[in-house]
Amino acid sequence: MEPPVKINCPTCGRRFLSDETPAMPFCSKRCQLIDLGRWMNEEIGLPHEGDPGDAPVEYLDDRDLTQPSPERQNESFHRYSE
């Protein structure tokens, strides 16, 4: 087991030994829950720049599923029996 190290809590900044808390890397369960709340409220997050190839998602309604797409209208589908 590694010896404890002094670290700063990312929520409150308090300096503590790493073996003092089960809520690592936070100094307490309270600080851990404060951080979780910030993530859930989208106050903090990971930076992300969209890929230039990312396109908006188009959703189909049920009517779109009953007809083949224009690209596939000429394809024939076969069922194979076992």
Curated annotation (Swiss-Prot):
<dbReference type="GO" id="GO:0008657">
    <property type="term" value="F:DNA topoisomerase type II (double strand cut, ATP-hydrolyzing) inhibitor activity"/>
</dbReference>
<feature type="region of interest" description="Disordered">
    <location>
        <begin position="44"/>
        <end position="82"/>
    </location>
</feature>
<feature type="compositionally biased region" description="Basic and acidic residues">
    <location>
        <begin position="72"/>
        <end position="82"/>
    </location>
</feature>
<comment type="similarity">
    <text>Belongs to the DNA gyrase inhibitor YacG family.</text>
</comment>
<dbReference type="InterPro" id="IPR005584">
    <property type="entry name" value="DNA_gyrase_inhibitor_YacG"/>
</dbReference>
<comment type="subunit">
    <text>Interacts with GyrB.</text>
</comment>
<dbReference type="GO" id="GO:0008270">
    <property type="term" value="F:zinc ion binding"/>
</dbReference>
<feature type="binding site">
    <location>
        <position position="27"/>
    </location>
    <ligand>
        <name>Zn(2+)</name>
    </ligand>
</feature>
<dbReference type="GO" id="GO:0006355">
    <property type="term" value="P:regulation of DNA-templated transcription"/>
</dbReference>
<feature type="binding site">
    <location>
        <position position="31"/>
    </location>
    <ligand>
        <name>Zn(2+)</name>
    </ligand>
</feature>
<dbReference type="Pfam" id="PF03884">
    <property type="entry name" value="YacG"/>
</dbReference>
<protein>
    <recommendedName>
        <fullName>DNA gyrase inhibitor YacG</fullName>
    </recommendedName>
</protein>
<feature type="binding site">
    <location>
        <position position="9"/>
    </location>
    <ligand>
        <name>Zn(2+)</name>
    </ligand>
</feature>
<keyword id="KW-0862">Zinc</keyword>
<dbReference type="InterPro" id="IPR013088">
    <property type="entry name" value="Znf_NHR/GATA"/>
</dbReference>
<feature type="binding site">
    <location>
        <position position="12"/>
    </location>
    <ligand>
        <name>Zn(2+)</name>
    </ligand>
</feature>
<keyword id="KW-0479">Metal-binding</keyword>
<comment type="function">
    <text>Inhibits all the catalytic activities of DNA gyrase by preventing its interaction with DNA. Acts by binding directly to the C-terminal domain of GyrB, which probably disrupts DNA binding by the gyrase.</text>
</comment>
